[in-house]
Amino acid sequence: MTISRFHVSRIFAILAGTAVLASSAVAATLTISTNASSNGNGLGGGSYTISGSGLDTSAYAPISLVGGAGTFESFCLEYTEYFSPGSTYNYTVANAAVAGAGGAVGGQDPVSLGTAWLYSQFANGTLSGFDYGAGRKTSNNFLQLAFWFFEDETPSISGYGPGYGFGDGNAFLDAAVTFFGSEAAAKADANGAYGVQVLNLTDKNGNNKQSQLYVSVPDAGSTMALLGLAMAGLAGVQRLSRRRR
């Protein structure tokens, strides 16, 4: 029996699907808390401290942390979604916020390039103009406003200022628009660019809670492991084929 390309493709698809199902069988949880630098703008914005997630936090520079090793600082994406500080929630990782409030289309609001570009630098400890020290709360204020701007939360907090528009005194927002060339370009979907993703939170009853930002490092290990599993499975099929000849 010969193995056609069609059968090889099916084998790879089945193995990949099995790996995905196995990884999603156990619900992941995290705890999200406020800290002394939260709510810098009086509108309930970040940063917030996320702990117990089990996520790889190696992309976060120590200077960006408030809660210490194993935690990371995040910001909210949807102005009209909420969470209870100190609570533990289930989460999934995606490139878009579920529901998404102001910028959602079809119940999904992809992270924008402007948001991804800024947050990745914040996490890396390299965001120009961000005060990681005593002035952190003020910096958080303007960074959170920039995220809400790029995620099209404007209808929710229209008229808020200063700092909620290009040329309105928000250095982070202005830098992102300048880097990408226009507001429209900075609001384009990131699709995982800069390693930035969304943590979509739900409570024990499945109710949506405030979606949060997360940045990861490229994981070559998982890709190679899946490829190895696929190749091992293919080798097994080939051996079985030879026995049946």
Question: What does each model-found stretch correspond to?
Answer:
Residues 28-215:
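Short, surface-exposed polybasic-aromatic patches that bind anionic ligands, especially phosphate groups
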